[in-house]
Amino acid sequence: MDLLLLEKTLLGLFAAIIVASIVSKLRGKKFKLPPGPIPVPVFGNWLQVGDDLNHRNLSDYAKKFGEIFLLRMGQRNLVVVSSPELAKEVLHTQGVEFGSRTRNVVFDIFTGKGQDMVFTVYGEHWRKMRRIMTVPFFTNKVVQQYRYGWEEEAARVVEDVKKNPESATNGIVLRRRLQLMMYNNMYRIMFDRRFESEDDPLFVKLKALNGERSRLAQGFEYNYGDFIPILRPFLRGYLRICKEVKERRLQLFKDYFVDERKKFGSTKSMDNNSLKCAIDHILEAQQKGEINEDNVLYIVENINVAAIETTLWSIEWGIAELVNHPEIQKKLRDELETVLGPGVQITEPDTYKLPYLQAVIKETLRLRMAIPLFLPHMNLHDAKLGGYDIPAESKILVNAWFLANNPEHWKKPEEFRPERFLEEESKVEANGNDFRYLPFGVGRRSCPGIILALPILGITIGRLVQNFELLPPPGKSKIDTSEKGGQFSLHILKHSTIVLKPRTF
Protein backbone atom coordinates (compact mmCIF):
# COMPACT_ATOMS: atom_id res chain seq x y z
CA MET A 1 0.00 0.00 0.00
CA ASP A 2 1.42 3.47 -0.88
CA LEU A 3 1.84 6.29 1.68
CA LEU A 4 -1.07 8.31 0.27
CA LEU A 5 -3.50 5.43 0.75
CA LEU A 6 -2.14 4.78 4.25
CA GLU A 7 -2.56 8.46 5.16
CA LYS A 8 -6.16 8.46 3.90
CA THR A 9 -6.88 5.28 5.81
CA LEU A 10 -5.53 6.69 9.09
CA LEU A 11 -7.46 9.95 8.66
CA GLY A 12 -10.62 8.02 7.90
CA LEU A 13 -10.02 5.79 10.90
CA PHE A 14 -9.68 8.82 13.19
CA ALA A 15 -12.88 10.35 11.82
CA ALA A 16 -14.70 7.04 12.18
CA ILE A 17 -13.68 6.79 15.85
CA ILE A 18 -15.26 10.19 16.55
CA VAL A 19 -18.44 9.34 14.65
CA ALA A 20 -18.69 5.88 16.20
CA SER A 21 -18.35 7.29 19.70
CA ILE A 22 -21.19 9.75 19.11
CA VAL A 23 -23.42 7.13 17.46
CA SER A 24 -22.70 4.66 20.25
CA LYS A 25 -23.86 7.13 22.90
CA LEU A 26 -27.00 8.00 20.97
CA ARG A 27 -27.88 4.35 20.39
CA GLY A 28 -27.18 3.44 23.99
CA LYS A 29 -29.89 5.90 25.06
CA LYS A 30 -32.37 4.83 22.42
CA PHE A 31 -32.17 1.05 22.39
CA LYS A 32 -32.37 -1.71 24.95
CA LEU A 33 -29.80 -3.90 23.25
CA PRO A 34 -29.09 -7.59 23.93
CA PRO A 35 -26.20 -8.36 26.30
CA GLY A 36 -22.70 -9.02 25.02
CA PRO A 37 -19.06 -8.14 25.49
CA ILE A 38 -18.28 -4.43 25.81
CA PRO A 39 -17.32 -3.00 22.39
CA VAL A 40 -14.67 -0.40 21.62
CA PRO A 41 -15.14 2.40 19.07
CA VAL A 42 -14.76 1.48 15.38
CA PHE A 43 -13.64 -2.09 16.00
CA GLY A 44 -16.51 -3.06 18.29
CA ASN A 45 -15.88 -6.60 19.57
CA TRP A 46 -13.79 -7.61 16.58
CA LEU A 47 -10.47 -7.39 18.46
CA GLN A 48 -11.91 -9.61 21.25
CA VAL A 49 -13.79 -12.09 19.09
CA GLY A 50 -11.65 -12.21 15.95
CA ASP A 51 -12.75 -13.37 12.53
CA ASP A 52 -13.54 -16.99 13.41
CA LEU A 53 -17.27 -16.78 14.11
CA ASN A 54 -17.86 -20.52 13.98
CA HIS A 55 -20.69 -22.41 15.67
CA ARG A 56 -18.61 -23.69 18.58
CA ASN A 57 -17.13 -20.30 19.47
CA LEU A 58 -20.59 -18.72 19.34
CA SER A 59 -21.96 -21.56 21.50
CA ASP A 60 -19.39 -20.65 24.16
CA TYR A 61 -20.56 -17.03 24.06
CA ALA A 62 -24.17 -18.20 24.44
CA LYS A 63 -23.24 -20.06 27.62
CA LYS A 64 -21.78 -16.81 28.95
CA PHE A 65 -24.27 -14.18 27.74
CA GLY A 66 -27.48 -16.16 27.25
CA GLU A 67 -29.90 -17.21 24.53
CA ILE A 68 -29.55 -13.90 22.68
CA PHE A 69 -26.45 -11.74 22.61
CA LEU A 70 -25.00 -8.91 20.58
CA LEU A 71 -21.57 -8.61 19.04
CA ARG A 72 -20.55 -5.26 17.57
CA MET A 73 -18.36 -6.31 14.66
CA GLY A 74 -16.91 -3.02 13.48
CA GLN A 75 -19.90 -1.05 12.23
CA ARG A 76 -22.21 -4.07 12.04
CA ASN A 77 -24.53 -5.40 14.71
CA LEU A 78 -24.37 -9.19 14.91
CA VAL A 79 -27.19 -10.75 16.96
CA VAL A 80 -26.80 -14.44 17.80
CA VAL A 81 -29.84 -16.53 18.76
CA SER A 82 -29.28 -19.80 20.63
CA SER A 83 -32.65 -21.05 21.91
CA PRO A 84 -35.56 -22.87 20.22
CA GLU A 85 -38.01 -20.20 21.37
CA LEU A 86 -36.09 -17.31 19.83
CA ALA A 87 -35.27 -19.35 16.73
CA LYS A 88 -39.02 -19.75 16.25
CA GLU A 89 -39.44 -15.98 16.55
CA VAL A 90 -36.79 -15.26 13.91
CA LEU A 91 -37.70 -18.00 11.45
CA HIS A 92 -41.46 -18.31 11.87
CA THR A 93 -43.39 -15.89 14.09
CA GLN A 94 -41.50 -12.84 12.83
CA GLY A 95 -40.37 -14.48 9.61
CA VAL A 96 -41.24 -11.42 7.53
CA GLU A 97 -39.45 -8.98 9.84
CA PHE A 98 -36.28 -11.08 9.92
CA GLY A 99 -36.59 -12.61 6.45
CA SER A 100 -34.03 -10.56 4.57
CA ARG A 101 -30.32 -11.22 3.94
CA THR A 102 -27.35 -9.12 4.98
CA ARG A 103 -24.94 -7.67 2.46
CA ASN A 104 -21.42 -9.04 2.32
CA VAL A 105 -18.59 -7.71 0.15
CA VAL A 106 -17.63 -11.17 -1.15
CA PHE A 107 -21.13 -12.58 -1.61
CA ASP A 108 -22.12 -9.36 -3.37
CA ILE A 109 -19.51 -10.25 -5.98
CA PHE A 110 -20.51 -13.89 -6.36
CA THR A 111 -24.25 -13.14 -6.56
CA GLY A 112 -24.17 -9.92 -8.57
CA LYS A 113 -25.44 -8.02 -5.51
CA GLY A 114 -28.32 -10.39 -4.89
CA GLN A 115 -29.46 -11.34 -8.40
CA ASP A 116 -29.78 -14.95 -7.23
CA MET A 117 -32.36 -16.58 -4.94
CA VAL A 118 -30.42 -17.86 -1.92
CA PHE A 119 -28.59 -14.68 -0.94
CA THR A 120 -30.99 -11.98 -2.11
CA VAL A 121 -32.91 -9.67 0.23
CA TYR A 122 -36.49 -10.52 1.14
CA GLY A 123 -38.94 -9.03 -1.32
CA GLU A 124 -40.51 -9.40 -4.74
CA HIS A 125 -37.31 -10.60 -6.44
CA TRP A 126 -36.84 -13.36 -3.86
CA ARG A 127 -40.49 -14.49 -4.19
CA LYS A 128 -40.19 -14.59 -7.98
CA MET A 129 -36.90 -16.52 -7.95
CA ARG A 130 -38.16 -19.00 -5.36
CA ARG A 131 -41.30 -19.64 -7.44
CA ILE A 132 -39.31 -20.10 -10.66
CA MET A 133 -36.87 -22.52 -9.00
CA THR A 134 -39.45 -24.63 -7.14
CA VAL A 135 -41.13 -26.45 -10.05
CA PRO A 136 -37.98 -27.67 -11.85
CA PHE A 137 -36.02 -28.51 -8.69
CA PHE A 138 -37.98 -28.94 -5.49
CA THR A 139 -41.11 -31.07 -5.91
CA ASN A 140 -42.03 -34.73 -5.45
CA LYS A 141 -42.43 -34.95 -9.22
CA VAL A 142 -38.75 -34.09 -9.61
CA VAL A 143 -37.82 -36.78 -7.07
CA GLN A 144 -39.83 -39.41 -8.94
CA GLN A 145 -38.42 -38.31 -12.30
CA TYR A 146 -34.78 -38.41 -11.23
CA ARG A 147 -34.58 -41.00 -8.46
CA TYR A 148 -33.70 -43.72 -10.98
CA GLY A 149 -30.71 -41.61 -12.00
CA TRP A 150 -29.64 -41.25 -8.36
CA GLU A 151 -29.89 -45.01 -7.92
CA GLU A 152 -27.84 -45.53 -11.09
CA GLU A 153 -25.15 -43.10 -9.93
CA ALA A 154 -24.91 -44.87 -6.56
CA ALA A 155 -24.62 -48.22 -8.37
CA ARG A 156 -21.80 -46.81 -10.51
CA VAL A 157 -19.96 -45.75 -7.34
CA VAL A 158 -20.24 -49.30 -5.97
CA GLU A 159 -19.04 -50.74 -9.29
CA ASP A 160 -16.05 -48.38 -9.55
CA VAL A 161 -14.98 -49.02 -5.96
CA LYS A 162 -15.10 -52.77 -6.49
CA LYS A 163 -12.91 -52.41 -9.59
CA ASN A 164 -10.24 -50.54 -7.63
CA PRO A 165 -7.96 -53.06 -5.85
CA GLU A 166 -6.70 -50.36 -3.46
CA SER A 167 -10.15 -49.85 -1.96
CA ALA A 168 -10.17 -53.22 -0.17
CA THR A 169 -6.55 -53.12 1.00
CA ASN A 170 -4.91 -49.77 1.70
CA GLY A 171 -8.11 -47.82 1.18
CA ILE A 172 -9.15 -44.85 -0.97
CA VAL A 173 -10.37 -41.29 -0.48
CA LEU A 174 -13.98 -42.14 -1.28
CA ARG A 175 -15.03 -38.49 -1.27
CA ARG A 176 -13.51 -37.95 -4.71
CA ARG A 177 -15.79 -40.52 -6.29
CA LEU A 178 -18.79 -39.32 -4.30
CA GLN A 179 -18.15 -35.78 -5.51
CA LEU A 180 -18.48 -36.97 -9.11
CA MET A 181 -21.70 -38.75 -8.13
CA MET A 182 -23.19 -35.60 -6.60
CA TYR A 183 -22.28 -33.47 -9.62
CA ASN A 184 -23.96 -36.05 -11.85
CA ASN A 185 -27.05 -36.17 -9.62
CA MET A 186 -27.56 -32.43 -9.87
CA TYR A 187 -26.37 -31.88 -13.46
CA ARG A 188 -28.83 -34.52 -14.63
CA ILE A 189 -31.59 -32.42 -13.06
CA MET A 190 -30.21 -29.11 -14.30
CA PHE A 191 -28.98 -29.92 -17.79
CA ASP A 192 -29.69 -33.61 -18.49
CA ARG A 193 -25.90 -34.01 -18.47
CA ARG A 194 -23.41 -36.21 -16.64
CA PHE A 195 -19.64 -36.60 -16.46
CA GLU A 196 -18.15 -39.99 -17.31
CA SER A 197 -15.21 -39.93 -14.93
CA GLU A 198 -13.23 -37.91 -12.41
CA ASP A 199 -10.77 -37.17 -15.24
CA ASP A 200 -13.34 -35.53 -17.52
CA PRO A 201 -11.62 -32.19 -18.42
CA LEU A 202 -14.83 -30.19 -18.08
CA PHE A 203 -15.58 -31.76 -14.69
CA VAL A 204 -12.03 -31.05 -13.50
CA LYS A 205 -12.34 -27.39 -14.54
CA LEU A 206 -15.81 -27.01 -13.04
CA LYS A 207 -14.81 -28.64 -9.77
CA ALA A 208 -11.71 -26.44 -9.47
CA LEU A 209 -13.64 -23.20 -10.04
CA ASN A 210 -16.40 -24.19 -7.62
CA GLY A 211 -13.78 -25.16 -5.05
CA GLU A 212 -12.04 -21.82 -5.40
CA ARG A 213 -15.33 -19.99 -5.06
CA SER A 214 -16.13 -21.90 -1.86
CA ARG A 215 -12.69 -21.25 -0.41
CA LEU A 216 -12.93 -17.52 -1.08
CA ALA A 217 -16.50 -17.14 0.17
CA GLN A 218 -16.30 -19.43 3.20
CA GLY A 219 -13.03 -18.08 4.59
CA PHE A 220 -12.97 -15.76 7.58
CA GLU A 221 -9.99 -13.69 6.42
CA TYR A 222 -12.08 -11.03 4.68
CA ASN A 223 -14.36 -10.30 7.64
CA TYR A 224 -12.37 -7.29 8.80
CA GLY A 225 -13.01 -5.45 5.54
CA ASP A 226 -16.68 -6.36 5.63
CA PHE A 227 -17.17 -5.26 9.25
CA ILE A 228 -15.01 -2.13 9.06
CA PRO A 229 -15.40 -0.38 5.68
CA ILE A 230 -12.47 1.95 6.33
CA LEU A 231 -10.21 -1.14 6.16
CA ARG A 232 -11.67 -2.32 2.87
CA PRO A 233 -8.77 -0.97 0.77
CA PHE A 234 -6.67 -3.74 2.28
CA LEU A 235 -9.03 -6.24 0.62
CA ARG A 236 -8.44 -5.03 -2.93
CA GLY A 237 -6.35 -8.02 -3.95
CA TYR A 238 -8.76 -10.50 -2.36
CA LEU A 239 -11.80 -8.94 -3.99
CA ARG A 240 -10.05 -8.80 -7.37
CA ILE A 241 -9.48 -12.57 -7.19
CA CYS A 242 -13.15 -13.06 -6.24
CA LYS A 243 -14.25 -11.08 -9.30
CA GLU A 244 -11.98 -13.08 -11.59
CA VAL A 245 -13.26 -16.41 -10.25
CA LYS A 246 -16.87 -15.23 -10.50
CA GLU A 247 -16.46 -14.17 -14.14
CA ARG A 248 -14.75 -17.41 -15.13
CA ARG A 249 -17.41 -19.53 -13.43
CA LEU A 250 -20.36 -17.72 -14.97
CA GLN A 251 -18.71 -17.87 -18.39
CA LEU A 252 -18.20 -21.61 -17.95
CA PHE A 253 -21.84 -22.12 -16.96
CA LYS A 254 -22.96 -20.08 -19.98
CA ASP A 255 -20.67 -21.53 -22.65
CA TYR A 256 -20.74 -25.20 -21.75
CA PHE A 257 -24.17 -25.70 -20.21
CA VAL A 258 -26.78 -22.95 -20.66
CA ASP A 259 -25.96 -22.12 -24.29
CA GLU A 260 -25.56 -25.80 -25.15
CA ARG A 261 -29.03 -26.48 -23.78
CA LYS A 262 -30.42 -23.54 -25.78
CA LYS A 263 -28.98 -25.08 -28.96
CA PHE A 264 -30.53 -28.43 -28.07
CA GLY A 265 -33.92 -26.82 -27.47
CA SER A 266 -33.80 -24.97 -30.78
CA THR A 267 -33.33 -28.21 -32.71
CA LYS A 268 -35.86 -30.27 -30.81
CA SER A 269 -39.55 -29.61 -30.26
CA MET A 270 -40.45 -29.67 -26.56
CA ASP A 271 -43.96 -29.07 -25.30
CA ASN A 272 -45.18 -28.87 -21.71
CA ASN A 273 -45.92 -32.59 -21.63
CA SER A 274 -42.44 -33.74 -22.61
CA LEU A 275 -39.71 -34.39 -20.07
CA LYS A 276 -37.63 -31.28 -19.50
CA CYS A 277 -34.57 -30.63 -17.42
CA ALA A 278 -34.59 -27.75 -14.96
CA ILE A 279 -32.78 -25.25 -17.17
CA ASP A 280 -35.54 -25.57 -19.79
CA HIS A 281 -38.04 -24.24 -17.24
CA ILE A 282 -35.64 -21.48 -16.20
CA LEU A 283 -35.05 -20.44 -19.83
CA GLU A 284 -38.81 -20.35 -20.40
CA ALA A 285 -39.07 -17.85 -17.55
CA GLN A 286 -36.36 -15.78 -19.23
CA GLN A 287 -38.18 -15.88 -22.57
CA LYS A 288 -41.33 -14.63 -20.84
CA GLY A 289 -39.38 -11.68 -19.46
CA GLU A 290 -39.69 -12.74 -15.82
CA ILE A 291 -35.91 -12.94 -15.34
CA ASN A 292 -32.81 -11.98 -17.32
CA GLU A 293 -29.76 -13.95 -18.44
CA ASP A 294 -27.78 -12.98 -15.33
CA ASN A 295 -30.55 -14.39 -13.13
CA VAL A 296 -30.37 -17.66 -15.08
CA LEU A 297 -26.63 -17.94 -14.46
CA TYR A 298 -26.99 -17.09 -10.77
CA ILE A 299 -29.59 -19.84 -10.39
CA VAL A 300 -27.01 -22.27 -11.77
CA GLU A 301 -24.51 -20.72 -9.34
CA ASN A 302 -26.82 -21.36 -6.40
CA ILE A 303 -27.35 -25.02 -7.26
CA ASN A 304 -23.60 -25.59 -7.65
CA VAL A 305 -23.00 -24.17 -4.19
CA ALA A 306 -26.11 -24.89 -2.16
CA ALA A 307 -27.08 -28.34 -3.44
CA ILE A 308 -23.97 -30.23 -4.49
CA GLU A 309 -21.42 -29.45 -1.79
CA THR A 310 -23.76 -29.41 1.22
CA THR A 311 -25.18 -32.85 0.43
CA LEU A 312 -21.68 -34.16 -0.23
CA TRP A 313 -20.52 -32.91 3.18
CA SER A 314 -23.39 -34.75 4.86
CA ILE A 315 -22.66 -38.00 3.00
CA GLU A 316 -19.00 -37.72 3.98
CA TRP A 317 -19.88 -37.11 7.63
CA GLY A 318 -22.31 -40.03 7.68
CA ILE A 319 -19.73 -42.43 6.27
CA ALA A 320 -17.07 -41.20 8.71
CA GLU A 321 -19.36 -41.80 11.68
CA LEU A 322 -20.25 -45.29 10.44
CA VAL A 323 -16.55 -46.15 10.03
CA ASN A 324 -15.89 -45.00 13.59
CA HIS A 325 -18.97 -46.79 14.98
CA PRO A 326 -18.89 -50.32 13.52
CA GLU A 327 -21.70 -51.47 15.82
CA ILE A 328 -24.02 -48.84 14.30
CA GLN A 329 -22.86 -49.79 10.81
CA LYS A 330 -23.69 -53.46 11.52
CA LYS A 331 -27.09 -52.57 12.94
CA LEU A 332 -27.90 -50.57 9.81
CA ARG A 333 -26.72 -53.39 7.55
CA ASP A 334 -28.85 -55.89 9.47
CA GLU A 335 -31.92 -53.68 8.97
CA LEU A 336 -31.27 -53.41 5.23
CA GLU A 337 -30.97 -57.18 4.88
CA THR A 338 -33.97 -57.93 7.10
CA VAL A 339 -36.33 -55.48 5.40
CA LEU A 340 -35.12 -55.72 1.79
CA GLY A 341 -33.46 -59.12 1.71
CA PRO A 342 -29.78 -60.03 1.22
CA GLY A 343 -28.35 -58.37 -1.87
CA VAL A 344 -31.54 -56.48 -2.77
CA GLN A 345 -30.30 -52.98 -3.55
CA ILE A 346 -32.03 -50.08 -1.82
CA THR A 347 -34.15 -47.73 -3.94
CA GLU A 348 -35.68 -44.36 -3.13
CA PRO A 349 -39.09 -45.74 -2.02
CA ASP A 350 -37.30 -48.17 0.32
CA THR A 351 -35.69 -45.37 2.33
CA TYR A 352 -39.00 -44.52 4.00
CA LYS A 353 -39.51 -48.03 5.41
CA LEU A 354 -36.07 -48.26 7.02
CA PRO A 355 -36.36 -46.48 10.40
CA TYR A 356 -32.79 -47.09 11.49
CA LEU A 357 -31.43 -45.69 8.22
CA GLN A 358 -33.60 -42.62 8.75
CA ALA A 359 -32.26 -42.34 12.31
CA VAL A 360 -28.64 -42.55 11.09
CA ILE A 361 -29.31 -39.73 8.61
CA LYS A 362 -31.05 -37.59 11.24
CA GLU A 363 -28.22 -38.11 13.71
CA THR A 364 -25.62 -37.21 11.09
CA LEU A 365 -27.49 -33.99 10.33
CA ARG A 366 -27.80 -33.23 14.06
CA LEU A 367 -24.20 -33.75 15.16
CA ARG A 368 -22.57 -32.65 11.89
CA MET A 369 -24.95 -30.02 10.56
CA ALA A 370 -23.76 -28.87 7.13
CA ILE A 371 -24.91 -25.25 7.63
CA PRO A 372 -24.62 -24.85 11.43
CA LEU A 373 -25.45 -21.13 11.56
CA PHE A 374 -27.80 -20.99 8.58
CA LEU A 375 -27.31 -18.15 6.16
CA PRO A 376 -27.55 -14.86 8.06
CA HIS A 377 -30.95 -13.21 8.37
CA MET A 378 -31.54 -9.47 8.59
CA ASN A 379 -34.29 -7.12 9.72
CA LEU A 380 -34.82 -4.25 7.30
CA HIS A 381 -36.41 -2.14 10.05
CA ASP A 382 -36.03 -1.75 13.82
CA ALA A 383 -37.49 -4.82 15.53
CA LYS A 384 -38.03 -6.50 18.90
CA LEU A 385 -36.67 -9.91 19.86
CA GLY A 386 -36.59 -11.59 23.25
CA GLY A 387 -37.50 -8.33 24.98
CA TYR A 388 -34.63 -6.46 23.32
CA ASP A 389 -34.44 -3.83 20.60
CA ILE A 390 -32.79 -4.98 17.38
CA PRO A 391 -31.60 -2.02 15.28
CA ALA A 392 -32.45 -2.07 11.58
CA GLU A 393 -30.13 -4.00 9.28
CA SER A 394 -28.69 -6.15 12.06
CA LYS A 395 -27.14 -9.45 11.03
CA ILE A 396 -29.05 -12.27 12.75
CA LEU A 397 -27.38 -15.66 13.20
CA VAL A 398 -29.38 -18.65 14.43
CA ASN A 399 -26.94 -21.14 15.94
CA ALA A 400 -28.80 -24.21 14.70
CA TRP A 401 -25.92 -26.50 15.65
CA PHE A 402 -26.16 -25.40 19.29
CA LEU A 403 -29.95 -25.86 19.25
CA ALA A 404 -29.33 -29.50 18.28
CA ASN A 405 -26.35 -30.04 20.59
CA ASN A 406 -27.30 -28.19 23.76
CA PRO A 407 -27.06 -30.61 26.72
CA GLU A 408 -29.99 -28.80 28.34
CA HIS A 409 -32.23 -30.07 25.52
CA TRP A 410 -30.56 -33.30 24.37
CA LYS A 411 -29.34 -36.41 26.17
CA LYS A 412 -25.56 -36.77 25.72
CA PRO A 413 -25.54 -34.68 22.54
CA GLU A 414 -21.81 -35.20 21.94
CA GLU A 415 -22.45 -38.90 21.22
CA PHE A 416 -23.32 -40.22 17.76
CA ARG A 417 -26.38 -42.25 18.75
CA PRO A 418 -29.06 -42.76 16.07
CA GLU A 419 -31.22 -44.61 18.60
CA ARG A 420 -32.25 -41.27 20.11
CA PHE A 421 -34.50 -40.72 17.07
CA LEU A 422 -36.21 -44.07 17.69
CA GLU A 423 -36.55 -43.54 21.43
CA GLU A 424 -36.78 -40.24 23.32
CA GLU A 425 -36.75 -38.08 20.15
CA SER A 426 -38.88 -40.35 17.95
CA LYS A 427 -41.27 -37.55 16.98
CA VAL A 428 -38.54 -35.18 15.78
CA GLU A 429 -38.26 -34.81 12.00
CA ALA A 430 -35.83 -32.96 9.72
CA ASN A 431 -38.60 -30.75 8.32
CA GLY A 432 -38.62 -28.33 11.25
CA ASN A 433 -41.43 -29.72 13.41
CA ASP A 434 -39.21 -29.17 16.48
CA PHE A 435 -37.19 -25.96 16.81
CA ARG A 436 -34.40 -27.79 18.60
CA TYR A 437 -33.60 -29.58 15.34
CA LEU A 438 -33.48 -27.53 12.14
CA PRO A 439 -30.92 -29.03 9.74
CA PHE A 440 -32.69 -27.41 6.77
CA GLY A 441 -34.11 -24.41 8.57
CA VAL A 442 -37.80 -23.59 8.61
CA GLY A 443 -40.04 -20.83 7.32
CA ARG A 444 -39.64 -18.51 4.35
CA ARG A 445 -35.86 -18.82 4.05
CA SER A 446 -35.65 -22.56 4.74
CA CYS A 447 -33.68 -24.79 2.40
CA PRO A 448 -36.02 -26.22 -0.27
CA GLY A 449 -33.35 -28.78 -1.13
CA ILE A 450 -34.47 -31.03 1.73
CA ILE A 451 -36.74 -32.85 -0.74
CA LEU A 452 -33.66 -33.89 -2.78
CA ALA A 453 -31.05 -34.26 -0.05
CA LEU A 454 -32.82 -36.79 2.17
CA PRO A 455 -33.45 -39.46 -0.51
CA ILE A 456 -29.96 -38.99 -1.99
CA LEU A 457 -28.45 -39.47 1.47
CA GLY A 458 -30.56 -42.57 2.04
CA ILE A 459 -29.76 -44.17 -1.31
CA THR A 460 -26.03 -43.44 -1.14
CA ILE A 461 -25.36 -44.46 2.46
CA GLY A 462 -27.66 -47.47 2.10
CA ARG A 463 -25.91 -48.79 -1.03
CA LEU A 464 -22.45 -48.37 0.49
CA VAL A 465 -23.35 -50.18 3.71
CA GLN A 466 -25.09 -52.96 1.77
CA ASN A 467 -22.14 -53.63 -0.50
CA PHE A 468 -19.11 -52.92 1.67
CA GLU A 469 -17.74 -53.18 5.15
CA LEU A 470 -16.49 -49.66 5.82
CA LEU A 471 -13.24 -49.63 7.82
CA PRO A 472 -10.43 -47.27 8.82
CA PRO A 473 -7.14 -47.67 6.94
CA PRO A 474 -4.59 -50.27 8.09
CA GLY A 475 -3.00 -49.46 11.43
CA LYS A 476 -5.76 -47.12 12.57
CA SER A 477 -8.77 -47.80 14.78
CA LYS A 478 -10.66 -44.65 13.74
CA ILE A 479 -10.53 -41.94 11.10
CA ASP A 480 -10.04 -38.27 11.94
CA THR A 481 -13.33 -36.39 12.24
CA SER A 482 -11.91 -32.98 13.12
CA GLU A 483 -14.18 -30.20 11.90
CA LYS A 484 -13.45 -27.40 9.48
CA GLY A 485 -15.86 -24.53 9.93
CA GLY A 486 -16.49 -21.77 7.42
CA GLN A 487 -18.62 -18.63 7.27
CA PHE A 488 -21.70 -20.84 7.13
CA SER A 489 -20.39 -24.37 6.55
CA LEU A 490 -19.26 -27.37 8.58
CA HIS A 491 -17.31 -30.04 6.78
CA ILE A 492 -14.66 -32.57 7.66
CA LEU A 493 -11.15 -31.16 7.97
CA LYS A 494 -9.35 -34.05 6.31
CA HIS A 495 -10.83 -36.15 3.50
CA SER A 496 -9.94 -39.48 5.05
CA THR A 497 -8.83 -42.68 3.43
CA ILE A 498 -11.19 -45.56 4.18
CA VAL A 499 -11.13 -49.26 3.37
CA LEU A 500 -14.17 -50.71 1.59
CA LYS A 501 -14.24 -54.51 1.75
CA PRO A 502 -16.78 -55.96 -0.71
CA ARG A 503 -19.45 -58.15 0.82
CA THR A 504 -20.74 -61.39 -0.67
CA PHE A 505 -24.43 -62.25 -0.60
From Swiss-Prot:
The lineage of its organism: Eukaryota, Viridiplantae, Streptophyta, Embryophyta, Tracheophyta. GO terms for cellular component: membrane. The keyword Heme applies. Pathway: Phenylpropanoid metabolism; trans-4-coumarate biosynthesis; trans-4-coumarate from trans-cinnamate: step 1/1. It comes from Catharanthus roseus (Madagascar periwinkle). Disulfide bonds: none annotated. GO terms for molecular function: heme binding; iron ion binding; trans-cinnamate 4-monooxygenase activity. Coiled coil: none annotated. Its cofactor is heme. It catalyses: (E)-cinnamate + reduced [NADPH--hemoprotein reductase] + O2 = (E)-4-coumarate + oxidized [NADPH--hemoprotein reductase] + H2O + H(+). Catalyzes the first oxidative step of the phenylpropanoid pathway in higher plants by transforming trans-cinnamate into p-coumarate. The compounds formed by this pathway are essential components for lignification, pollination, and defense against ultraviolet light, predators and pathogens. Its EC number is 1.14.14.91. It is a single-pass membrane protein. This is Trans-cinnamate 4-monooxygenase. Keywords: Heme, Iron, Membrane, Metal-binding, Monooxygenase, Oxidoreductase, Transmembrane, Transmembrane helix.
